[in-house]
Amino acid sequence: TGGLWGLDKKAFTMGRIDIRAKFDSAQGFWPALWLLPQDGDAPNSGYGELDIVEHLNFDPYVHMTLHSEYTNLVDKVNTPNAVQAPFNEGEFNIYGVEVHEDKVVYLVNNKEVYSYPRLYPEIPGQFPFYGQKQFYVILSAQLGGQWVGSVTAAHLPAGLYVDWVKCYDAIENE
């Protein structure tokens, strides 16, 4: 288990972040590329968390999830906040997230796979991603845990390989 945390090192005001990565499959292996706010605890304190990509075990898809106070505590049913997206197993893929004034868009290999709308501007916890809030990148690989289950030693070693991380400022006039 290990990773790289960008907290207090480099933070980004949202636009688009792409990460070119590949990972091995193994029972109990959980690679994750995600974003947390530089200035607060996420996601139940009103801040957000953007899971750019997570992979579990031998799943033929990746998980892309958006967490907020709203999706975790207020409305867990009516506003879907996640997608299971296809990817090219065993190859480098580009996983991305774009934050716009009115939506968050997830991409795999530059193809949109999910969009989360800003539905209620009057509810701060529903869409805490847009504006001047800065997020930092976490690149992590975990062995074991409640979501992935126990590790099967015969499947190891397993690795997460990151080729690059690119960050783009928002170019639209929002």
Model-derived regions: residue spans:
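GH16 jelly-roll
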Residues: 1-174
